[in-house]
Amino acid sequence: MSEAIENRNGRALVGVVVSDKNDKTIVVRVETLVKHPLLKKYIRRRKKFTAHDPNNECKVGDKVKIIEFRPVSRNKRWHLVSILEKAV
């Protein structure tokens, strides 16, 4: 099923898992760099996304790729595509 998900159009983000306490759910923190309009300095912005992890394979600290998907629940609109790097 992950191959079908990878081929979908939509936003794909890379982030770090900060929580895996819920069943089949992970919380992923995504960091982006935004240029400040006045200071012309890059600022690190962080946002948390709740993603669906059907096999409960992610652990805290894993670097993962998530993709925008149909709503699974009230807060989950993202789906785990792959684990890029396992936590030590």
Swiss-Prot record:
Keywords: Ribonucleoprotein, Ribosomal protein, RNA-binding, rRNA-binding. One of its GO terms (cellular component) is cytosolic small ribosomal subunit. GO terms for biological process: translation. The keyword Cell cycle does not apply. GO terms for molecular function: rRNA binding; structural constituent of ribosome. Part of the 30S ribosomal subunit. NCBIfam families: PRK05610.1, uS17_bact. Belongs to the universal ribosomal protein uS17 family. One of the primary rRNA binding proteins, it binds specifically to the 5'-end of 16S ribosomal RNA. This is Small ribosomal subunit protein uS17. It comes from Oleidesulfovibrio alaskensis (strain ATCC BAA-1058 / DSM 17464 / G20) (Desulfovibrio alaskensis).
